[in-house]
Amino acid sequence: MARYTDSVCKLCRREKQKLFLKGQKCYTEKCPIESRNYAPGQHGLSRRSKVSEYGVQLREKQKIKRMYGLLETQFRNYFEKAIKQKGITGENLIKILERRLDNVIFRLGFAASRSQARQLIKHRHFMVNDRLVDIPSYLVSQGDIVKVKEKSKKLDAIHNSLKRVKESAYPWLTIDKATLTGTFLQVPERADVPLNANEQLVVELYSK
């Protein structure tokens, strides 16, 4: 499966909620879903057909997958990893996804979207525990320190993104804006993750 190349705003409209895929635009009135909160396409307003149980499960899987910017193979691999862990599979899946470096960068506020975070990581702007990491899928562990590389501390993209961030937006993260450093305190509990999705539907879908 290739990367999605059409307008990502259409994905939000299809799910009828913000997936925060477009960076700063998602936080303004320019976000298309503010004025067109219906499915894209010629018949977007008139789509009222009954959705099957499978359709509901598939829609939820697609939504979570798109939120985190993953391909189907990647997403399925994370699910298989979640199954092998102790606890509730759906919650394990979300916890794994929250540990991805691109997601942590986004949550810390160093990037306006996970997509932008991936670009910044690939361009070698971040360090984890003083080691340069250029792999967006790198899984951050409890106690890891994520910081902007010294030569990258003047990047406008990072500073513009930080303007929308509070000092302690998430209980499992801390951020020092002065040094552009963040700490991953612990793997978050599912209840703390601001994700409007039902991961149990994904478990049901993949269990068929």
Residue positions per predicted region:
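Glutamine-centric residue-chemistry signal
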Residues: Q24, Q116-Q119
